[in-house]
């Protein structure tokens, strides 16, 4: 299994067609493609010679974002993203409909030019509990605005077997305070 920070930000979906960014949307299905192009950590094109269409998910956040800020404020900051405006960052963490394991997908995302979250790997569930305790003590992922950690299955076979529910994947679990 893998463990990543649960970034306190706004989930964003991106769609690339023949390597070009063609669509971006928030979890509320808000179309934000024009504004998202201003975020420097989102590639406008990727090398995708294997697939005609690729969809991925990540999180848009500000290094200074905290839980008291609203996600709507974060999205509205997209309208003001300039050289002197707020710095918004994007971490990609999932390729939809992928048959690869989690770590391979993260490597692919990096090859396409995305930043990905710090990812820890273990086969021991007790280690996940120890990492969660470290996170609570602000000793893990403390350089990021987090509101928990996420434990995920690494295996694509296990992920496909467990499937997804209407609100979240059954192969991932968020651990918070």
Residue map of PLM features:
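RNA/tRNA-interacting regions in translation and RNA-turnover enzymes
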Residues: 1-177
């Amino acid at each position: 299994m893998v463990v990543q920070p649960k970034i306190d930000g706004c989930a964003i979906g991106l769609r690339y067609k023949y390597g070009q960014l063609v669509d971006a949307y928030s979890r509320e299905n808000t179309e934000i493609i024009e504004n998202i192009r201003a975020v420097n950590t989102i590639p406008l094109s990727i090398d995708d010679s294997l697939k005609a269409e690729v969809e991925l998910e990540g999180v848009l956040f500000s290094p200074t974002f905290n839980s008291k800020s609203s996600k709507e404020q974060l999205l509205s900051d997209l309208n003001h993203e300039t050289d002197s405006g707020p710095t918004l960052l994007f971490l990609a963490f999932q390729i939809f409909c992928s048959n690869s394991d989690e770590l391979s997908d993260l490597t692919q995302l990096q090859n396409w030019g995305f930043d990905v979250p710090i990812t820890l790997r273990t086969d021991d569930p007790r280690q996940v509990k120890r990492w969660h305790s470290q996170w609570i003590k602000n000793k893990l992922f403390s350089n990021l605005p987090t509101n928990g950690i996420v434990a995920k299955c690494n295996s694509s076979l296990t992920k496909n077997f467990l499937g997804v529910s209407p609100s979240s994947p059954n192969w991932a679990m968020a651990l918070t305070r």
